[in-house]
Amino acid sequence: MDSKQSSELVFTVRRQKPELIAPAKPTPREIKFLSDIDDQEGLRFQIPVIQFYHKDSSMGRKDPVKVIKKAIAETLVFYYPFAGRLREGNGRKLMVDCTGEGIMFVEADADVTLEQFGDELQPPFPCLEELLYDVPDSAGVLNCPLLLIQVTRLRCGGFIFALRLNHTMSDAPGLVQFMTAVGEMARGASAPSILPVWCRELLNARNPPQVTCTHHEYDEVRDTKGTIIPLDDMVHKSFFFGPSEVSALRRFVPHHLRKCSTFELLTAVLWRCRTMSLKPDPEEEVRALCIVNARSRFNPPLPTGYYGNAFAFPVAVTTAAKLSKNPLGYALELVKKTKSDVTEEYMKSVADLMVLKGRPHFTVVRTFLVSDVTRGGFGEVDFGWGKAVYGGPAKGGVGAIPGVASFYIPFKNKKGENGIVVPICLPGFAMETFVKELDGMLKVDAPLDNSNYAIIRPAL
């Protein structure tokens, strides 16, 4: 069941006045254009990340706020575009005005210990809005700070590092690269071990642009029957998939798909279960968008140090009836094929589509979007106090349309089992059904040919 300790936790945060942290040295004043993969409507939002750290006696009386502030300023010398502001040109083209103004920073103290958050840190986190304060007039896509960072000291000597990123600037690997650099500088490095590479022109549209692949992820879908997720009464819960849960789910995998990855399995199961919980019309189309990192799909691969967005949203499409009535293998095959669609040509085709179609938003009507950050490295970021107890997305359901996106986050439960935790955001009525369907499939005596089940239990 859900952890009650952290969900009912109440505490007070005292914040200092927000300030701007500029690069520690003068940086170039120039205009740098985003790529046509960065520059799409579906990335024009802020994404929250949170990291929890224990007290480390070897750090003595060092103040994490002061250490991290200094490290950010030093890191921005290398990542100076983050200290600028986004502007919009002709054709809605985004560019960074490298003004050197700096990123937004908040210093805070909380009258709570890390232990009070519970022994299994996972989204949703209590009082997130206090740990990552939405500084007034700071959250716009244009003419606003591109990063907001809050460091909150805890009563026990630990601290919380929370960050909000303008997603048009970077994807998860790019953000982790920046955070890792801040950690290295905080530990005394004179330069990041991986130097940042801009080169956004590598993911620009061709001249002339030519869409050569099918991109149903950008279809214009009308919400004819009011099936966009209602934004009121949204419920956030996290679900843990450890070895026993994954093993239980694999019982439903047909023999010819037995080598499927855990990502493919979970995506098929969650998509199916989520669709049944929302109860769309049987003949309506439903979609699963799988974020695929395309860095290695290029020949040659994108350069080491590239920190822009370099992923695609390949999509699996079927009807609600086919998804719910067919065995799990049906959804699994759709997901497997979708992942394999992403090639260098596919990425070039997406960039061309952005220019030709006016930078459209990916389809959100009856859509489930999943992003795997299990190898993202958030938890490895070390500012001198060791690795994070928890590091990764602060909540699920983020984006322009809440409730669409979920993340696969590496997690160790209190039994010491390594697994994946998945934050899910659904309306209250749907969450009840979702949990019921999940429980059903995990039962030892669950009927293997029953297509009406799809999966897992809330994280303990």
From Swiss-Prot:
The active site is at 167 (proton acceptor), 382 (proton acceptor). InterPro entries: CAT-like_dom_sf (IPR023213), Plant_acyltransferase (IPR050898). Its EC number is 2.3.1.196. It comes from the Eukaryota. It is an enzyme of class 2 (transferase). One of its GO terms (molecular function) is acyltransferase activity, transferring groups other than amino-acyl groups. Keywords: Acyltransferase, Transferase. Induction: Up-regulated in the leaf during the hypersensitive reaction provoked by a pathogen infection. It catalyses: benzyl alcohol + benzoyl-CoA = benzyl benzoate + CoA. The keyword Cell inner membrane does not apply. Belongs to the plant acyltransferase family. Probably involved in the formation of volatile ester benzylbenzoate. This is Benzyl alcohol O-benzoyltransferase. It comes from Nicotiana tabacum. The gene is HSR201.
